[in-house]
UniProtKB/Swiss-Prot annotation:
Protein name per its UniProtKB record: Ovalbumin-related protein X
InterPro entries referenced in this protein's UniProt entry, alphabetically: Serpin_CS, Serpin_dom, Serpin_fam, Serpin_sf, Serpin_sf_1, Serpin_sf_2
Gene3D superfamilies: Alpha-1-antitrypsin, domain 1 (2.30.39.10), Antithrombin, subunit I, domain 2 (3.30.497.10)
Induction remark: Up-regulated by dietary stress. Significantly increased expression between days 0 to 5 in egg whites of eggs laid by corticosterone-fed hens (at protein level).
Tissue: Expressed in egg white (at protein level).
Signal peptide boundaries: none
One of the Pfam families matching this protein, by short name: Serpin
Species name: Gallus gallus
Any one Gene Ontology BP term: response to corticosterone
Length: 232
């Protein structure tokens, strides 16, 4: 699915070694969205600008956290595997994503999503179909993090090659992610219906403006994918 990660112009006669990393994710929900409920709706890129998006919709029971101090809601959507979940971090305001990006760290994320904060509630979820493909040159990023020795002629890479003066010429990363309505069971199964019957009237989680999302491996509490959805 990830094509042309390295274009011909990205290498030349001086290129000795290129570090390439790619990640592909196409998730299947534990509970499918009904494709008949998907509608074209506006996605508010800013307070002044919106773009059309195919918005999926489901009324079901999910783990949700409402964080008034952070002016944000968090929704957990489980995937079919049972080990993976998607967490959506939705600011209350259209223009508030940058503020959350500046304050978020692993400790805060762990606090926001722990069982004492998240609770299972009946929620009407609006979530755009997502198909994201991005490519990044990470050379300058890695050097800014202090990994400078890899990119200079005196790099010590004898553990992988006996070639002299071997260094990494550039580091390239590609990511592809696709999410649609597909799931392994339909909303409205007996267990879900009974759960919803004993819940108050459903609230809305309307992801119609920029948000953060992450894919988490629950058994190890490991984040395997972290991204931003800011425009269709």
């Amino acid at each position: 699915q990830i094509k042309d990660l390295l274009v011909s112009s990205s290498t030349d006669l001086d290129t000795t070694l290129v570090l390439v990393n790619a990640i592909y994710f196409k998730g299947m929900w534990k509970t499918a969205f009904n494709a008949e409920d998907t509608r074209e709706m506006p996605f508010h890129v800013t307070k002044q600008e919106s773009k059309p998006v195919q918005m999926m919709c489901m009324n079901n029971s999910f783990n949700v956290a409402t964080l008034p101090a952070e002016k944000m809601k968090i929704l957990e959507l489980p995937f079919a595997s049972g080990d993976l979940s998607m967490l959506v971090l939705l600011p209350d305001e259209v223009s508030d994503l940058e503020r959350i990006e500046k304050t978020i760290n692993f400790e805060k994320l762990t606090e926001w999503t722990n069982p004492n904060t998240m609770e299972k509630r009946r929620v009407k979820v609006y979530l755009p179909q997502m198909k994201i493909e991005e490519k990044y040159n990470l050379t300058s990023v890695l050097m800014a993090l202090g990994m400078t020795d890899l990119f200079i002629p005196s790099a010590n890479l004898t553990g992988i090659s006996s070639a002299e003066s071997l260094k990494i010429s550039q580091a390239v990363h590609g990511a592809f992610m696709e999410l649609s309505e597909d799931g392994i069971e339909m909303a409205g199964s007996t267990g879900v219906i009974e759960d919803i019957k004993h819940s108050p009237e459903s609230e809305q989680f309307r992801a119609d403006h920029p948000f953060l999302f992450l894919i988490k491996h629950n058994p190890t509490n490991t984040i395997v994918y972290f991204g931003r959805y800011w425009s269709p």
